[in-house]
Amino acid sequence: AEFTRLEYIEATETEGITALPGAIALLSHLNKAGIPWAIVTSGSMPVARARHKIAGLPAPEVFVTAERVKRGKPEPDAYLLGAQLLGLAPQECVVVEDAPAGVLSGLAAGCHVIAVNAPADTPRLNEVDLVLHSLEQITVTKQPNGDVIIQ
């Protein structure tokens, strides 16, 4: 009962929840370009859906929440499931994370990882593909052969 109450509070207390700068434009571009993407979160479905709606993010093809995996971040399970549901191998996926547990999870899953505003003391931060301060620094293009280039 206590968890349900806390979950309700988290799902309804959405003041201050906003999309990261550049997130809406980036995700909209992915949709237009036909590039599959997922939201993979440690939050429960009610909390994740409420925050997703408040942030005004486009709808993902795949939504992985805490209920869908046995082990949460920093274990790789959530990102492995996200890749599977997208029909991709983990090494074909790019994880964009701001939390240390998420960075570790993405690396453990074998995905490429972009850390955005991750704390400087994030373990294994030196192993990620890119460290950025804003999603506005990312450009994504889909090549005629289907390859996706991230710069």
Stretches found by the model and what they are:
Residues 1-25, 33:
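Metal-dependent phosphoesterase signature
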Residues 28-31, 45-151:
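Asp-based, Mg2+/Mn2+-dependent phosphohydrolase catalytic module
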Residues 36-38, 112:
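Proline-centered loop/turn at the N-terminus of a beta-strand
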Residues 41-43:
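Conserved phosphate-coupling serine/threonine residues in phosphotransfer and NTP-handling enzymes
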